[in-house]
């Protein structure tokens, strides 16, 4: 297949390019410099069978401060990319988020649960889902959560840096104990998307996220133990952090049936130790 990937220079986009190429597909990756997704006509130059839209504005606090820009990029532009894919008779794969849910259920969210976002980022991503579906009957919405990947900065590397600073200063490390989610290793997510795209019995909406669900505190503790960093930890409530955007407290995704289990813990350990973690087998 010929596969076009937007956001190809991003944390997930790089892994998508690698995963589709490893599976033998012809891939064209479009970075932000290559393609403004609010004006996606350049996609017509690449006659694709599949378009994966991983481009997004994921700065949740930025989205809260400028919801119109969030809606333009995450909502309207997603629909425009989907329309170009439809004109090329291509499948559109839209990457979405657990933040389309409000996080109030006492169980994980399934694909058929009603979205009800509580922040500007979630609202813009839900608008993107709706626009993608309206523009292209051949669509696959992939909801995921708490992405972290090799190279660059991610939750694990940020926690290790913060813990080292706190330990050197003789201060406790404050960690949120009541926000629960699914850490998701981007190589695992990319491999799952390749598998989903090549299936004959594709669904229209799937949840692809790491297991088991965990708090930010619990995730951090796995990384700290792996890196052998000793620091006093001060568990705090999400509400004590002043932020422009309020994340849902428990927007845990139930991975869809048939999606390979993706345990986030081995990758977190390897990432914390500075080793090249690989996708789950």
Question: Where do the PLM segments sit?
Answer:
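NAD(P)H-binding glycine-rich loop region in Rossmannoid oxidoreductase-like domains
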Residues: 41-75
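NAD(P)-dependent short-chain dehydrogenase/reductase
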Residues: 130-181, 187-188
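Adenosine-cofactor binding site in Rossmann-like domains, unifying the SAM/SAH pocket
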Residues: 27-42
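SDR active-site strand-loop-helix element
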Residues: 6, 30, 54-55, 92-98, ...
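N-terminal Rossmann NAD(P)H-binding glycine-rich loop of SDR-like oxidoreductase domains
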Residues: 1-21
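Catalytic helix-loop patch of NAD(P)-dependent Rossmann-fold dehydrogenases
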Residues: 65, 72, 77-80, 100-142, ...
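C-terminal amphipathic/interface module of NAD(P)-dependent oxidoreductases
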Residues: 229-231, 246-281
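Mid/C-terminal beta-alpha module of Rossmann-like enzyme folds, strongest
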Residues: 171, 192, 199-243, 272-281
